[in-house]
A protein has these predicted regions:
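Glyoxalase I/VOC metalloenzyme domain signal
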Residues: 1-5, 10-30, 47-188, 192-285
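Short, solvent-exposed beta-strand-to-loop segments that form ligand-recognition rims
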Residues: 34
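N-terminal low-complexity or amphipathic/hydrophobic leaders
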Residues: 38-48
């Protein structure tokens, strides 16, 4: 099973406010419509590689969202991550055979503002309530019904998404992901500015992060205590972080293993959404 990121949901209590903030930093989303159950709606920032950020919120403050209610209520940002697969049912069977619990398949849908109906199958991996492992998705309708490149990023320097997943035990989590997805041995480093020890899997859009115990990781410990093991950040890949800085509102980059990361210049998005260079050589600024 390969790790091809389909999308990362970003939980916000107010979709209009989230859209305004993303637009301010240069990532203007497009409204995507309401999910079939009517309790959530979303906006999309779609990249050229087909991946996208999904800003998701409840449709009515008096009705609990069916998806990620605790994350949405608290404006928690990244709340899950999704990978594309050819066949959800077949993928879930392989995961069961590997000894991991699953839920699904389920069929979901969303109606776009123009009336187009997108439909897809999804399946969840791992224990109920945990977003440590990705959920899986396969389209029933043409993928373009669900997402296409968004004007604010199409043809630009941002080329895709990498997920940073907060975990409690880095060693055990590395082994679990390597066993399930056949990943290479990760590179590891402590990143003081992020307050975490990070493992990055070469060639795959995944990093695992566990809090440093020197006080700098307090924010990440609190996030784990509140939401459990789940994504804590999204990094948007770029070949040229300097060009990305010219087009989007970014803070000064910092070292990130053998790469560099620049967080978006937003208190709401700090340490939750950034840009990552593909290599040190491409990261000059």
């Amino acid at each position: 099973m390969t790790l091809t990121i389909d999308h990362v949901p970003i939980a916000r209590s107010d979709l209009d406010a989230a859209t305004e903030e993303f637009t301010r930093v240069g990532l203007e989303p497009e409204y995507g419509g309401t999910h079939a159950d009517g309790t959530t709606h979303m906006a999309v920032v779609g990249f050229d590689d087909g991946s996208y950020l999904e800003l998701i919120s409840g449709t009515d403050p008096d009705i609990e969202p069916d998806l990620w209610p605790a994350f949405i209520d608290a404006d928690a940002g990244p709340c899950a991550w999704c990978i594309s697969v050819e066949d959800v049912a077949a993928t879930l069977q392989r995961v069961i055979d590997a000894g991991v619990r699953v839920d699904g398949p389920q069929t979901m849908a969303r109606e776009r503002p123009d009336g187009t109906r997108a439909e897809w199958d999804i399946g969840f991996l791992g224990e109920p309530g945990s977003e440590k492992f990705p959920f899986t998705i396969a389209d029933r309708a043409p993928r373009s019904y669900r997402v296409s490149p968004t004007e604010s990023v199409a043809g630009g320097p941002l080329t895709g998404i990498e997920a940073v997943v907060a975990v409690r035990n880095l060693d055990a989590s590395v082994e679990a992901f390597r066993r399930l997805f056949r990943l290479a041995t990760p590179a590891r480093a402590e990143i003081p500015e992020f307050g975490a020890a990070v493992a990055s899997f070469p060639g795959d859009p995944l990093m695992l992060a566990t809090p440093l115990d020197d006080g700098r990781g307090t924010w990440l410990t609190e996030r784990l205590d509140t939401y459990g093991e789940s994504p804590c950040a999204c990094l948007l890949s770029t070949e040229d972080i300097q060009t990305a800085d010219e087009e989007y509102a970014l803070r000064e980059p910092t070292e990130w293993l053998d790469r560099r990361v620049a967080w978006f210049d937003s208190d709401e998005l700090d340490r939750a959404l950034g840009v990552v260079s593909r290599s040190t050589a491409a990261a000059g600024r």
